[in-house]
Amino acid sequence: MTPELRWLSDPTVFAVNRLDAHSDHLCCRTLDEAESGLTSLRQSLDGAWRFAWSANPAARPADFWQPDADLSGFGTIRVPGHIELQGYGQLQYTNTLYPWDGRSCLRPPQVDWNDDPVGSYVKEFDLDESLRGQRVCVSFQGVEQAMYLWCNGQFVGYAEDSFTPSEFDLTPYIRDENNRLCVEVYKRSSAAWIEDQDFFRFSGIFRSVYLYAKPRVHINDIWLRADLAADNTTGLLTPLVKLDGETDGASVALVVTDPEGYAVYEGPAAGDTIEIEGIQPWSHAAPVLYHAVLTLRDADGVLQEVVPYDIGFRRFEMINGVMCLNGERVVFNGVNRHEWNADRGRAIGADDMHAAMAVFKKNNINAVRTCHYPDQSLWYDLCDRNGIYMIDETNLESHGSWQKLGAVEPSWNVPGSLPEWKDCVVDRARSMFERDKNHAAVLIWSCGNESYAGEDILAMSQFFHDHDPGRLVHYEGVFHCRAFDAISDMESRMYAKPWEIREYLESHPKKPFILCEYMHDMGNSLGGMESYVRLADEFDQYQGGFIWDYMDQALRHTDALGRSVLGYGGDFADRNTDYNFSGNGIVYADGAEKPAMQDVRYWYDTPARRAAHDARNAAAAARADRDAAKAQAARKPGTLTVTEGDGNLGVRGDGFEILFSAGEAGPSSLTVNGSEWLWRAPRPAFWRAATDNDRGCGFPQKAAAWLAADVYLQNLGFAVLQKSADGVQVRYTYGVPTVPGAKAELTYTVEPQGTLLVEAVYHGVPGAPELPCFGVKFQTFAPVARTLWTGLSGETYPDRCKGGVFGCHEEVPHIEPALVPQDCGLHVGTRQFTLEQHNACGQTAAALTIEQADAPFAFSALPNTAQEIEAAQHITELPATGRMSVTILGAARGVGGIDSWGTDVEEPYRVSGEGEHCVAFRIVL
């Protein structure tokens, strides 16, 4: 057969000579190999390959696959790995718009032949001794996006589908030594129209490549269907085994052992259902796995292969419109997870997967959706072992073909009901199903993501239903096309508002409800999670959701000034792009947990454990309040010395001095034990740096007057209300330049007990826009090395604070490394905090403590002002000033999280500009 370039633009050609998909089992030569997890029947081809990159097909070295081809102009590339992360081609991130939008006028299934980069790979190798003399196949675990394959100058085959294995039989072409394997990888093909996921657009061989040998008779596929009877103690095991080769007279034996190593079944694997008594069911709470070992012998009784596989017995079904596992309702406390590494992109390793699983277990995450493609097989093994429920999603997304700039316009949607696309997408469903069907963790098959609906996706759903009665089928896209409601067994939506979900659940629906995506964690987000979790307590048919998403998709690179930074769309001269819209993770791109994670951990815990957490916090807060009251009562009054100048009022006490300035509209100096604490006079605070969610709902535009107010307050007067040795009280009044105008006041009372009471009041006016916050702000004169506080742990906001643990905490002041800097570091419900300055030896040189007056407050201590943060596009752009920006708030806007493109913060967490707001606190002098 002669390969043809036209295959790239023909959706009916997606596999040429590709072997049938099969289970992800490991074939070993001996029992010892099987127990070690290693096999002599495989040979890895990972590592360095010869490589040449071309901008388009016309520029490629078309005959590089010839045995005598001159490769002197080839470089090297790492496999697995992305071409674009190894110095070739153009990096690009885009969400829904196709990468070529505005540059090429295309419609499905067209390809721009002038802009379709090609990677030419060559691997030279000798066959391992353990593979010689047998049938040999090659497995490409992931190639993006279309590949042609040659071996020793002979064309072998062609394949698409970036995220499931493509395997080929090399037996007619391979020799023991001096083999040359050549792969031509195209970045774009007709498959590009249905691989329009919201991610960086890469190409190349990004998952492992290996050879495997098939003995005389070979276990080609297994399906160990491990069902559970209604009594939840009887396992129903149906071992289905497909052989190839010299199958006449061959036999397969099966041994199944329990977690303690005792055999629960020994006998043939003949396809009959085997009843096993005393089974421990598999679930998140108890992910019990049984160890199965298949042994294959040829007609002469000679051992040919041994296949180990861990299986879990469970029963997943719909009961009266509720999804149930082993007879009990299941609630998905889930997260969407892209495969990602900040240095390697989607070419992740085992270390990445183990790290992610540790985060899942620590934070009560019990479910994952493999958005929007099948993951590496190891991830499924880890989910089996750790009881993580899976929605396994087909590699299908055509978002840009039916939704343009937010508007639903499916006139040229693919695959739709187009017959030429049907086989292609059903094949993708089949490839995923065949590979992953043995995994207990996979409860639900998903037909893909954001591809509208039609007969083709209905055919995918029918395939899953026909082949696997033990699982359910998911697809959210029918929300936009109700004519195809039958595709999905459940009502699945993304970013539905809590009140919309309630309306659905109160309508007595036939289908249960899940959120396949919710809580869009872009930047500083995840506020209001309570509104969703409470639905699960109230409605049996609300069965949870999957946070969007697990990890920020950002790439570590060096910026124009030589600084290492996590880059996002646009940082790589990529256009079109969606900039930082890929930064939605509950962990940063380097794997560090975001502050919001403590609320994930709290809300994904059981109701009983949440109640116990709340009770502990309430008791700890009550103790702290009692201790603070005792400490305040124990303070002894002293004598104040007052000095009245022409423009300043000075107050001196035991170890402190304050200078109230009429001209600066506030205290210009606050020295405690000889250390100056004020860089400039404190001011009322009206602004926080906009968050991604703020920007998404247009809040900065609506509240822009408060940015001006935060910077350009008008000094309306300075009044001395009390002046004596027993106390001094002064008041500053400010004009707030909003429309309509408003007023604010700061009142300072120097108390003889050695404290400075600060009271801030904002007087609202009708028609004033909503506030980001209100309180008091100041900058310290010198750097602050450490902040200590009594209150809730971590970063907390009014709509994201339940996960905090009440107690005494500390941190080094910092800006959270969101892809685009934004407000961060707030601590609500604070009783007191201390700013520490350190000397060169790291010892405390000075400290300033601020405590609540009549009620807890919120505070932040950040190395930059709100305006500096607002102006930066990367954390490396923030100036190092040597000062600390301290803000104490009586009112603060929540961060929201329903979505990041239109929905405002929930009503209880907004700050009205029409009402009065105040905060009071004491500075201990």
Regions picked out by a protein language model, each given a short descriptive name:
Residues 1-37, 104, 193, 303-627:
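Extended substrate-binding grooves/exosites of carbohydrate-active enzymes
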Residues 150-156, 257-259, 326, 654, ...:
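Short strand-turn-strand beta-turns centered on an Asx-Gly dipeptide
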Residues 216-245, 595-616, 629-647, 760:
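Surface beta-strand/loop "capping" patches
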Residues 2-19, 27, 31, 35-36, ...:
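Accessory beta-strand-rich segments of carbohydrate-active enzymes
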Residues 49, 53, 127-129, 142-144, ...:
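Beta-strand elements of well-folded, non-transmembrane domains
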Residues 206-223, 313-329, 625-631, 785-789:
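Low-complexity, Pro/Ser/Thr- and charge-rich linker/hinge segments at domain boundaries
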Residues 84-86, 92-94, 187, 283, ...:
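Beta-strand/loop-rich accessory regions of lumenal/periplasmic or secreted enzymes
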Residues 172-178, 242-319:
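Extended acidic/polar, glycine-enriched regions
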